[in-house]
Amino acid sequence: IQEDERGTYILNSKDLNMIEHLKELKDAGVNSFKIEGRMKSPYYVANVVNAYRRAIDNMDSLTPEYIQELKNELIKTSHRKYTTGFYFGADDKECLESTYPVQTHEFMALVIGDSDGQKVLIEQRNRFKVGDELEVLSPNDTFNKIIKVEKMENELGEDVQDAKNVQERLYLYTKLPL
């Protein structure tokens, strides 16, 4: 049993990650994939679904470089060490994890309105400021694009330098269609 400021943990299992073995699973007759989204953030679910969707859509032409790019996407969200479980026998006999989840990126905002070519309505989830760089997670061509926060306004049109109010709705100025 472990405890920290976020809660008590009795049995923490490693996170299953089969993204580099999807072709093998398909060849074995698997025709449907499921991710574990229970007790996960919307950012986690969106990021994992996005990575797996890209892998599935490109399954017949996956290169080692593209698989590594997708694996790099998966480590951005909060996760424990990865395992392939018992898919390949008992090589990874220790499925329990005693360390805490890690992540390299934070979920900053959710796009909630259409872009007008100059700005887009967002709902803030974590603090960021003018001058910060944000990476876009999207199912379209803006996937992985970096935008620099040049200007923000609240819904009254007032200038905002620091998005620090939880779930505040702001207009983020960007020429990138989001």
Regions found by a protein language model. Name each.
Residues 1-178:
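Surface-exposed amphipathic alpha-helical tracts and adjacent flexible/coil segments at the periphery
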